[in-house]
């Protein structure tokens, strides 16, 4: 008979994932052992393996959870408003997620090659879904640019994906202002960005 699940199973699993994101973000996946993860969680390696069959599964879970939050934000942003309003809402949601989950975002950007093929395929499929949403918005805003919407989409992500490294919630630039600036820059070029 299978052992019943502990009442705090989800809480413990989430704590392991938070520690994994923090350690993988700081030391890299290859530079972190399961013993390091267990120590950070103040638990045993065997308990880590109770929640995750392998170290690879912890990496996959960190990435999948972060991508699921991004997919949910994209889906929510697509519900109302014009294409430009949806792009602004999506950009703001993404920036908030990037800053609020710095470690997970860093892991997603830097550790993809460490996933086993099967898990990498799943993560890349989620990334492509998010890219497709933004590409659709750009195409809706500027249908005349249809032949180059994918490169424009990738430029857009190049502009916002690294904000987690420098944007601080307590800083002079709010996520809201930066999201608007990014969309203005994307849609109207540098001439549209104001200093105020």
PLM ranges: what are they?
Residues 1, 96, 100, 131-140, ...:
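C-terminal peripheral helix-coil segments that are non-catalytic and often amphipathic
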Residues 1-27, 32-42, 56-60, 65:
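Basic, helix-initiating cap at the start of DNA-binding domains
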Residues 3-11, 53-57, 61, 65, ...:
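Residues at secondary-structure transition points
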Residues 41-52:
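Short hydrophobic/aromatic patch on the recognition helix
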Residues 61, 75-100, 153-156:
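Hydrophobic alpha-helical connector segments
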Residues 65-71, 117-142, 150-154, 177-180, ...:
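Amphipathic alpha-helical packing segments from all-alpha helical-bundle domains
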Residues 95-135, 165-167:
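Short secondary-structure transition hinges
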């Amino acid at each position: 008979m299978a052992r019943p699940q502990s009442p705090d199973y989800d809480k413990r699993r989430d704590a392991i994932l938070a520690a994994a994101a923090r350690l993988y973000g700081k030391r890299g996946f290859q530079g972190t052992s399961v013993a390091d993860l267990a120590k950070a969680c103040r638990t045993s390696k065997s308990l880590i393996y109770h929640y995750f069959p392998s170290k690879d599964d912890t990496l996959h879970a960190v990435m999948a959870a972060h991508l699921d939050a991004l997919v949910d934000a994209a889906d929510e942003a697509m519900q109302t408003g014009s294409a430009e309003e949806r792009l602004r809402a999506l950009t703001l949601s993404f920036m908030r997620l990037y800053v609020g989950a710095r470690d997970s975002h860093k892991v997603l950007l830097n550790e993809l090659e460490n996933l086993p093929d099967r898990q990498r395929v799943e993560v890349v499929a989620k990334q492509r879904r998010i890219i497709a949403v933004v590409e659709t918005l750009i195409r809706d805003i500027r249908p005349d640019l249809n032949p180059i919407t994918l490169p424009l989409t990738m430029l857009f992500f190049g502009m916002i994906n690294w904000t987690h490294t420098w944007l601080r919630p307590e800083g002079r630039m709010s996520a809201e202002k930066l999201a608007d600036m990014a969309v203005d820059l994307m849609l109207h070029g540098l001439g549209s960005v104001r200093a105020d």
